[in-house]
């Protein structure tokens, strides 16, 4: 990736667990982000983001598939091993995702874009852009 010389470790994509479902022995943590809408490189090529506090793979006690919030049947990413049982409302942080999240996103079926924010030195999130229905509507015209 030629651009990685300039855009390495650009920022995180923070998501939240909205539900946990189990089918055929696989637990899926449904997130409030979408792999197809917010992280398409994870589906289009073999890019595996680092997930804070987790390891890729099925070794360990707390194994989850991470699922996106779109209606696309393939909107999920692999199996991840966590050191604890995930809870609804818990934050899941994808490292080094902003460089593609902001330039390759789409609003498939009206899926919201994540807000663009920076953490201040005081630890407060300062929001620069919050996307709305009007942003979705305007992209359609």
Predicted segments, located by residue:
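Charged (often Lys/Glu-rich) extended helix/loop segments that serve as interaction or gating elements
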Residues: 2-141
């Amino acid at each position: 990736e030629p651009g990685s010389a300039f855009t390495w470790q650009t920022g995180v994509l923070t998501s939240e667990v909205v539900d946990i479902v189990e089918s055929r022995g696989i637990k899926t943590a449904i997130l409030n982000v979408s792999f197809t809408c917010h992280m398409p490189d994870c589906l289009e090529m073999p890019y595996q983001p680092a997930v804070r506090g987790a390891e890729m793979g099925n070794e360990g006690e707390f194994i989850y598939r991470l699922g996106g919030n779109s209606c696309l049947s393939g909107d999920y990413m692999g199996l991840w091993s966590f050191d604890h049982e995930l809870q609804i409302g818990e934050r899941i942080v994808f490292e080094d995702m902003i460089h593609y999240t902001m330039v390759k996103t789409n609003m498939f079926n009206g899926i919201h874009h994540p807000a663009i924010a920076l953490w201040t030195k005081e630890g407060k999130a300062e929001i620069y852009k919050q996307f709305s229905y009007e942003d979705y509507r305007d992209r359609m015209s």
